[in-house]
């Protein structure tokens, strides 16, 4: 997927960034002058934020400038506290600032907002008739934490049961649990590959994958996003050239992709990538954080959706904090690989194991999905999120928004581009009781700021229509409908009423 930014949009976006950058440096120059003239008065707000004599400043350079001059202007749009469960609607705590957004203070007031921000894909984050009683019982039996790692005293029967259930669910021989999704990638990848190995990573892979790849010590090469042809070209070059300087053969090669890319909502071209990897005898590692549970006829992710045999993906990673309403992550692979990880991965050996109630939540949610609770609620949830996602995406496109991603994906970003329009859109939606997430640089390229919508099975059709009406009105207000509006004679969704 290549996003072609219109020339006028690119020019105005760069102008906006340039304006903020220029005025930011101008203010810093005046502050430096004031610090020379009135050192004690101006030091308290120095750019480095560090006034202790004799100590090197901790916060310096471009990162410090970006935080002070760019992010501070919009930080009220991020990290908004909530005061309820992250269901289809939740309570957002109102905040205020008396110092130009340097600090934000919570009030006692809350706003009930439509939740288009959370990764609660199947709605399990709310109280559930099957899951919640079992989670409460596990809390009474095991307490909130094991206070130990899996290799010490933190290995409960629940952990063993969930590993077996995960392996069965994703159709792999074995699995390992970790207490955090991010750490699953950042800690597992260095345990799989090291110096003398080659990692070939998609250019838009998640930061946790990037961190894990860098920590591994392996050589890293990046292929064009979701481009199997470029992947094959890169593999041929690297295999023929060998390791840097010595030109010895690589000890192992690992290709890393995501099932659904979290900032694009785009499905991985898995069949084509698997074909290339098989041809050159290299290992595949797929992150299914946003796809497991959310796509596929029975919720088994991208492999099921695209008709790929799970045996063809050597290592499958997933998080438990999205579709399953809990926390943690897993790796599913062959028994030999999982045994190796259990003996070598620092997060497994030294890190505290998953909280038992969190483990029980995943067990219960997974059983609902599999229909082992004696109902068809799981199948209905999977059908509901597919219908909700495709309906919402279709309506956004009809309204003229530039929507990224593929059908069936519950992640649907639409382009905003201009850095001033992102916070304006977010704040105006919040005023109208709709919570959305703006995403900009450095999480995305400089020109490609966007709003990311996440859909849940817990959303009713009325909820989605309400969200579409607000998004359409605010989109008109801030001017982010970059595509022609589809002319149809029909529903109030295409021609939203004034709120």
UniProtKB/Swiss-Prot annotation:
UniProt name for this protein: Long chain base biosynthesis protein 2b
Molecular function terms, GO-annotated: pyridoxal phosphate binding; serine C-palmitoyltransferase activity
EC id: 2.3.1.50
Superkingdom of the organism of origin: Eukaryota
Any matching Pfam family: Aminotran_1_2
Job description of the protein: Serine palmitoyltransferase (SPT). The heterodimer formed with LCB1 constitutes the catalytic core.
SUPFAM superfamilies named among the record's database cross-references: PLP-dependent transferases (SSF53383)
Cofactor: pyridoxal 5'-phosphate
Lineage: Eukaryota, Viridiplantae, Streptophyta, Embryophyta, Tracheophyta
Membrane topology term: Single-pass membrane protein
Predominant cellular place of this UniProt entry's protein: endoplasmic reticulum
Subunit structure: Heterodimer with LCB1. Component of the serine palmitoyltransferase (SPT) complex, composed of LCB1 and LCB2.
Family membership: Belongs to the class-II pyridoxal-phosphate-dependent aminotransferase family.
Catalytic activity: L-serine + hexadecanoyl-CoA + H(+) = 3-oxosphinganine + CO2 + CoA
Subcellular compartments: Endoplasmic reticulum membrane
One Gene Ontology term, aspect cellular component: serine palmitoyltransferase complex
Cited Gene3D superfamilies: Aspartate Aminotransferase, domain 1 (3.90.1150.10), Type I PLP-dependent aspartate aminotransferase-like (Major domain) (3.40.640.10)
GO terms classed as biological process: ceramide biosynthetic process; sphingosine biosynthetic process
Class of the enzyme per the UniProt entry, highest EC level: transferase
Keywords linked to the UniProt accession: Acyltransferase, Endoplasmic reticulum, Lipid metabolism, Membrane, Pyridoxal phosphate, Sphingolipid metabolism, Transferase, Transmembrane, Transmembrane helix
